[in-house]
Structure formats: structure tokens, C-alpha cells
A protein has these predicted regions:
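Acidic, metal-coordinating catalytic segment for phosphate/diphosphate chemistry
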Residues: 2-42, 48
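Conserved Nudix-box catalytic region and its N-terminal flanking loop in Nudix hydrolases
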Residues: 47-86
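Short connector loops at helix/strand junctions that flank enzyme active sites
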Residues: 38-40, 60, 65, 106-108
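Unchanged
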Residues: 70-93, 101-155, 186
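Active-site beta-strand termini and strand-to-loop segments that position acidic
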Residues: 45-48, 113-115
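Charged phosphate-binding loop/patch that engages nucleotide di/tri-phosphates or the phosphate backbone
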Residues: 153-186
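A generic fold-level signal
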Residues: 36-38, 47, 105-106, 128
Length: 186
């Protein structure tokens, strides 16, 4: 899509706020009204060999892109840097904003970056602990296939937790498809 988002909050520079994906469908997050809508940042962190970092929830077999919600007065870029470190253990560099994903629950600022240095221990919290989350280095095409498989396997699920995880996987799948389709990785 070539629509432009009117909000531009990363530093004072003009950045790419290309809307990658919009979904305002009626979903199942009524219990979360107090914390939505929220602002978040997420993205693709790619090594020089082409592999990317993903956050893997082993207990349910879910791959997700590193990212999460904005805290306090963070800029979207600061949020991505913090979340990337928390979920992957890596510091990141060469950070490029490529657009936004909007849905009824949040606006996610989408970035591409490179890891540097040695990975530190990750610090999962909440659902991340519950689902035995860990960081993996994987081929992006394989990650996309696994995301699509997860969506198909959970298509008929009716419990709220599975629906939420499937919805988040669909969002990340759209982001990764966009990145791969537009040759945005090195």
C-alpha cells in the first residue's frame, strides 16, 4: 500500500511511514480494552549470512518477530532497540524504519536492523516464560513457512489464548512477507 501515515515520531527526520498492513477486523480482544490501542515496535534483525533472529515460543511452536510495546516516552526506534535486546540478547545497528502495521489493537512501527556483538542472556517475562520462549537464528523463508503452518494449524481454534497467538502470528507473517517481497533484506 502506498498510503502515508500522518504521524511521524522517530527523531526529527522524515521517515518511511508506508502502511505495510492494515486490519481493523472485529477480533477477540475485548478483555484487553484497558491497554489498547497501544504503540509498539517490531522488526527483522538480519545477520550478514542472511539468517534472521526470531523469538520462538517452544511450548506452542510459534515464531514471532522481536518486538513489543512502547514504554514511557520512548520513540519507536528506542522501543525496537530495547525489545530487540530483551528478546534476542543482541544490540542492533543500521536500524531502518520501513513502515507501520495498523490494526484495531495497536500501531506497530516496523524496522530492519543488524545484530552486533555477542548475544547476552535474554530475559523473558509473562507469556514468554509460560510458553518457554527462546531466541533462534533461522532462514527467513523457513520462518515464513513455519508462521504459515502455525496459522493453518490454529485456524479452527476457539480458545482465546490460541486466537490471540494466531492473530499475532498473522501480523508478523504479513511483515515478513512484505520484507521478502520487497527485497528489503541484504
Amino acid at each position: 500500500m502506498n498510503k502515508k501515515d500522518e504521524t511521524n515520531t522517530v527523531t526529527d527526520e522524515v521517515i518511511n511511514d508506508n502502511i505495510i498492513y492494515e486490519d481493523y477486523g472485529n477480533i477477540f480482544l475485548d478483555d484487553f480494552v484497558d491497554c489498547w490501542p497501544r504503540e509498539a515496535s517490531r522488526g527483522v534483525i538480519q545477520f550478514s549470512d542472511g539468517d534472521i533472529l526470531v523469538f520462538f515460543k517452544e511450548r506452542i511452536g510459534q515464531y514471532k518477530l522481536p518486538g513489543g510495546g512502547k514504554e514511557n516516552n520512548e520513540t519507536p526506534e528506542q522501543t525496537f532497540i530495547r525489545e530487540a535486546y530483551e528478546e534476542t540478547g543482541y544490540m542492533i545497528k543500521n536500524i531502518r524504519k520501513i513502515g507501520v502495521v495498523k490494526d484495531q489493537t495497536q500501531t506497530s512501527h516496523i524496522f530492519i536492523a543488524e545484530p552486533y556483538g555477542e548475544a547476552q542472556e535474554i530475559h523473558p517475562d509473562g507469556d514468554e516464560i509460560k510458553f518457554d520462549a527462546k531466541c533462534l537464528k533461522r532462514n527467513p523463508v523457513d520462518v515464513l513457512k513455519n508462521m504459515k503452518k502455525f496459522i493453518i494449524e490454529h485456524k479452527g481454534d476457539s480458545d482465546e489464548s490460541s486466537l490471540i497467538q494466531s492473530y499475532f502470528t498473522q501480523r508478523d507473517c504479513k511483515i515478513l512477507e512484505y520484507v521478502l517481497d520487497h527485497n528489503l533484506l541484504a
